[in-house]
Amino acid sequence: MSIVEIKQQATQKMQQSLESFQHNLTKIRTGRANPGLLDTVHVDYYGSMVPISQVANVALLDARTISVSPWEKGMGAKIEKAIRDSDLGLNPASQGDLIRVPMPAMTEERRKELTKVVRAEGEHAKVAIRNLRRDANDGVKKLVKDKLASEDDERRSQEEIQKFTDRFIADVDKLVTGKEQDIMAV
């Protein structure tokens, strides 16, 4: 494996770590409604568990309410039960063919708790990115040891790897800050 391939692979894996972190952040509830919040909720559909988005239209009614419109009339009760049974703390209300999911107001204590969770998730993402940096640097050192690259190439590569590591960590920090502001906004 060449230095270029090592750097490309490290960059791709760091990007995947960042995307995974972003996906994990969407699962954390803020005071505002977000249709992505229901992505983790699965409902029984003819014997198999599928995400709600595959059996209904999920949209925002307003800043604090999600609407769920089942495509089949018989699915309403199952969707409502799946949302209620999820660990999201939501209480859906059925209005004919439409299910309204209001976002309950969060207490100050709950907001602080969620902020800690966001920071912990951010720290996990940073650790994953730093581990990828270490693996990439180890790969470059192995090439130098095997006389497939010079020490100058090693130094330059490590500087480049550090630069994109810093960039990804800064992106994680921005996402953490943004999510904390969303959570703390009343």
Curated annotation (Swiss-Prot):
Which GO cellular component terms are attached?
cytosol
InterPro entries, A to Z: Ribosome_recyc_fac, Ribosome_recyc_fac_dom, RRF_sf
Instruction: State the Gene Ontology BP annotations.
Output: cytoplasmic translational termination
Question: GO molecular function of the protein, one example?
Answer: ribosomal large subunit binding
Keyword annotations from UniProtKB, A to Z: Cytoplasm, Protein biosynthesis
Any Pfam family the entry gives: RRF
CDD domains reported for this sequence:
RRF
Matching entries from HAMAP family are given as: RRF
Q: Which NCBIfam families match?
A: frr
The record's comment on protein family reads: Belongs to the RRF family.
What function does the entry list? Responsible for the release of ribosomes from messenger RNA at the termination of protein biosynthesis. May increase the efficiency of translation by recycling ribosomes from one round of translation to another.
Q: What is this protein called?
A: Ribosome-recycling factor
- State the encoding gene: frr
